[in-house]
Structures are given as structure tokens and as C-alpha cells.
């Protein structure tokens, strides 16, 4: 029988070869790995994302707000290619220290607001524009329950 004692290393080292092609997307790194300034457009909302299920949620919300006539929901969408590591660039990490898409920079106020995680962005937009989030307690609880379920 072999020795079953496990001693964790003093410093964890990420094994770049482990996990295949997609392992690097969620690698355990804190902070940026490269300098990269994010583009900024002319609209109040700057969305940094990709067409993944979580990435698309915010785009759908912004489009629905625009359809309701909320011009403050105009946005510029910028591609964050998670396959090439864009999410680890300094500009993106400044908005989302967890290096995950989507991330939103709301520049509609004098001090820009960074919002990350799809659910947090959806709640921010719903509260900001007074749409899609009920105020009646039972309806709000049901809405938030479904929102949290999808994350």
C-alpha cells in the first residue's frame, strides 16, 4: 500500500499543459497578465463580452431596454476573445478582477460604474431604468429566483 499522506505545496504552480485547450480560459491567476487598453465608444454603456450564453444575456437586456425607449441604454459592444486571453488584459481586469465575461462600464454618471457578472449587470440595468424587475415583494422574489437560477 502506498503512503496516502498529502502535503500541499508551499506555492501553487499552474500546470499549463493540464486540462486541454480550454483550461487556460479559467486559469487560477489574479491580476492582469498583459497590458491592454480597452476601446471606449461614444455611448453611455460599454459592454465587453463575447457571444456566449452569459455574454448574450446583457446584450438582450440592453436591446429590450432600447425597444422600450430607454435611450440611456445605448451601448457599444466590444469583443473579448477568451480563446486568446483578452480577459487577462489590464483594461479588462480593471473592470472585472475575476477576468470573466461579461463586464459593463456604465459611463452615464460623472463617476463611471464598473459592473461584472451577468446577474449583477442585469440587476444594475433593471434598477437603473426601472424595467423588468418588479417592486412588489412576491413578484420581485420570483424574478430574482429565476435570475439566480440561470447563473
Please name every model-derived segment.
Residues 1-151:
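GST-like domain detector, emphasizing the conserved glutathione-binding G-site
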Amino acid at each position: 500500500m502506498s503512503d496516502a499522506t498529502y502535503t500541499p505545496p508551499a506555492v501553487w504552480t499552474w500546470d499549463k499543459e493540464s486540462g486541454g485547450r480550454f483550461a487556460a480560459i479559467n486559469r487560477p491567476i489574479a491580476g492582469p497578465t498583459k497590458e491592454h487598453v480597452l476601446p471606449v465608444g461614444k455611448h453611455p454603456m460599454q459592454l465587453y463580452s463575447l457571444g456566449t450564453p452569459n455574454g448574450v444575456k446583457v446584450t438582450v437586456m440592453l436591446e429590450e431596454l432600447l425597444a422600450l425607449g430607454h435611450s440611456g441604454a445605448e451601448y457599444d459592444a466590444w469583443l473579448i476573445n477568451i480563446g486568446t486571453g483578452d480577459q487577462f488584459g489590464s483594461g479588462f481586469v480593471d473592470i472585472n478582477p475575476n477576468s470573466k465575461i461579461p463586464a459593463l462600464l456604465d459611463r452615464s454618471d460623472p463617476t463611471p460604474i464598473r459592473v461584472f457578472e451577468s446577474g449583477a449587470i442585469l440587476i444594475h440595468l433593471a434598477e437603473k431604468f426601472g424595467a423588468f424587475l418588479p417592486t412588489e415583494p412576491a413578484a420581485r422574489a420570483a424574478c430574482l429566483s429565476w435570475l439566480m437560477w440561470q447563473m
